[in-house]
Amino acid sequence: ITSMEVSAELGGRILDEFPDASVDVHEPDLTLSVEIRDKIYVYSQTIKGAGGMPIGTNGKAMLLLSGGIDSPVAGYMIAKRGVKIDAVYFHAPPYTSDRAKQKVVDLAKQVAKYSGPIRLHVVNFTDIQLYIYDQCPHDELTIIMRRYMMRIAEHFAKESRCLGLITGESIGQVASQTLQSLAATNEVCTLPVYRPVIGFDKQEIVERSWEIGTYETSIQPFED
């Protein structure tokens, strides 16, 4: 039996049950869809899901997770392609508070609703940050700190048998995210660095964060 024959048979039976109904194949008020598998499934509404691939089918990667808007979205997007993620957060007390750390823990839990369980590594970055501040040119502080973060993240990634790093960087969004700056941070890594939101503008990232439910947590006023 063909799909056209199924349509004709089911359509006829529906019209028998509802004689006041009529068929309009061009502008229908209601479209009924039918899937025949082990059983017959009839439905009138299709709800779009996240799509993507089963978690873990494309290996594992390490997400550099902050309390901002971008990195949770990056983690979600790479997880949607079947990549299992772990995460690393750089905490710098007393310059960042315990509430800031809790915000990142909460974000990891929110992303984990889509990605499956996330192992979160919390790194005390204060001593390294102060050393860089004392010893390095101040106009290069951000890039140098970022290079240290990438090295540390790669250490945890290799321990966890991850196949790459994930960041929420987007070209030109801030001064430290020019192509030259991204190349400078890449230089310290031997693993590939994946940047799922690299071509997004800020509004596009914000919209995606609303969709996945991380936006309200990300904008909580705790420095990360």
Across the structure, where does each feature detected by a protein language model lie?
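RNA-binding accessory domains that recognize and position tRNA/RNA substrates
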Residues: 1-62, 72-119, 126-127, 187
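Short hydrophobic alpha-helical runs that function as membrane-insertion/retention elements
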Residues: 86-88, 195, 218
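A short alpha-helix-loop-beta-strand transition element characteristic
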Residues: 213-221
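Conserved G/P- and acidic residue-centered "switch" motifs that form tight phosphate/ATP-binding loops
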Residues: 68
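Small/polar glycine-rich anion-binding or flexible loop at a beta-alpha turn
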Residues: 171-173, 221-224
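Active-site adenylate/phosphate-handling loop in enzymes that bind or generate adenylated species
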Residues: 9-18, 46-58, 129, 135-207, ...
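Residue-level detector of anion-binding/catalytic polar loops
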Residues: 84, 163, 215
